[in-house]
Amino acid sequence: MSTLNEIQFQIINSLVFAEPFDTLAEEVDATEPVIAAELKTLIDKRFVQVLEDVEGSLRKSFYYDSDNMRAFQYQATSRGLDGLNK
């Protein structure tokens, strides 16, 4: 497992429960473009899963619009949460 940098650590720590991108923008100490880039990296590593709202219920999404990160919610996976303990 790769080591998390400080921004990635903050992102995963904020995503114990499903949260929108705006919550990350408030809680993580970085600019929105940096948060978005690090979030995309965490998604690629399967440390974070993408969730979409389908008729009022959050469901796992197998794709996301990287140009519109606010359209989805995000949650740390068990693999991502394990990274907090390293």
Predicted regions and their residues:
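Short amphipathic alpha-helical interface segments
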Residues: S2-A30, A37
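Short, amphipathic alpha-helical interaction segments positioned at domain boundaries
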Residues: K60-K86
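Low-complexity, flexible helical/coil segments
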Residues: Q8-I12, V48-E52, L84-K86
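Short amphipathic alpha-helical interaction segments
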Residues: D29-K45, Q49-E55, M69-A71
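N-terminal leader segment of winged-helix/HTH proteins
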Residues: M1, D44-K45, Y63-D67
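Generic detector of short alpha-helix boundary/capping microenvironments
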Residues: I12-N13, V34, Y64, N68
